[in-house]
């Protein structure tokens, strides 16, 4: 797992202090199952982090500390995408990160894929199409490992708001996904959840839990802003097929009650869980649906330990567990 320890207080205005302890819990629940590559800003930053991890009895022998000065900590979107070729070789694909076509502070993050792949000795392939370096964040797609990818029109096709690749069509994206990710089948949902500053990332919305099963969030309150859009996405899934021509199993996941802070609706969603080799970390929100969501996800992953991570403070940064972590295949 690739993580970057936060150092930018502006990502969690007024709530930065508890974020360090949330990250401590995250690392603590990953290291029993796989190594962590932990990106830190400096030698002093690393010392402070090690002190916190030791206080929490985290096995730091399972952590590789890498010094690189990032802008932000959202590894899902700024890290390279890893693929395995037909011979089983792991390669890294570099999709361009531009701050979700919204923020200006991404000039350091754009060099992260090169730093990481040099550090771990993997080949880095720049995703080029029509003489352009394709912009794509890891949180905007989810795959089943067999050739099917799910994404949203809101994120990739909006031609006015947070435009990633001006002029790109569904056909263009299908070509890019096929060439660089081996994708033969693309599922297009419509809109993401309310409060998501990425403008429609699918990892808050709909996730594969195995090659044949999709977990999608559902809002039952007709007065909630998410109600119409989320139910529309569920309707879209009724007619889709996988790469093998079969219909997927669809499981619905509840949404927590609307979570607000400082007059902002936050993108709280149980779908932003993170899968490790032996555990599944699920964001929880002090909500009545926490237990229900943990139960549903536990049934989807019977061989993994499902662990709730308190994310009320974390989501003030407008993302949670899947957003901040990135898997690296062995």
Regions flagged by a language model, labelled:
Residues 1-330:
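The feature marks the mature, well-folded catalytic cores of soluble enzymes
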């Amino acid at each position: 797992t690739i993580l970057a320890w936060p150092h930018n207080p502006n990502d969690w205005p007024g709530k930065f202090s508890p974020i360090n302890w949330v990250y401590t819990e995250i690392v603590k629940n990953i290291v029993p199952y796989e190594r962590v590559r932990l990106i830190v800003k400096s030698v002093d930053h690393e010392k402070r982090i090690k002190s916190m991890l030791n206080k929490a009895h985290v096995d730091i022998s399972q952590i590789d500390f890498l010094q690189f000065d990032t802008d932000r900590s959202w590894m899902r979107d700024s890290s390279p995408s890893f693929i395995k070729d037909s011979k089983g070789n792991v390669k890294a694909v570099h999709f361009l990160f531009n701050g979700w076509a919204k923020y200006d502070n991404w000039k350091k993050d754009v060099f992260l894929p090169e730093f990481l792949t040099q550090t771990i000795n993997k080949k880095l392939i720049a995703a080029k199409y029509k003489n352009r370096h394709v912009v794509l964040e890891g949180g905007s797609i989810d795959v089943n490992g067999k050739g099917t990818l799910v994404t949203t029109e809101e994120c990739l096709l909006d031609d006015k708001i947070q435009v990633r690749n001006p002029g790109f069509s569904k056909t263009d994206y299908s070509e890019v996904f096929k060439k660089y990710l081996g994708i033969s089948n693309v599922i297009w949902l419509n809109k993401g959840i309310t409060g998501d500053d990425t403008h429609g990332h699918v990892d808050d919305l709909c996730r594969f839990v195995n090659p044949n099963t999709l977990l999608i969030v559902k809002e039952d309150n007709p007065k909630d802003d998410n109600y119409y859009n989320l139910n529309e996405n569920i309707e879209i899934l009724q007619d889709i097929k996988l790469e093998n021509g079969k219909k997927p199993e669809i499981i619905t996941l509840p949404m927590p009650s609307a979570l607000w802070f400082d007059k902002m609706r936050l993108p709280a969603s149980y779908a932003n869980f993170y899968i490790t080799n032996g555990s599944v970390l699920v964001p929880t929100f002090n909500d009545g649906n926490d237990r229900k969501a943990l139960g549903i996800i536990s049934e989807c992953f019977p061989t993994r330990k499902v662990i709730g991570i308190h994310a009320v403070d974390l989501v003030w940064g407008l993302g949670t567990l899947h957003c901040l972590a990135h898997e690296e295949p062995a």
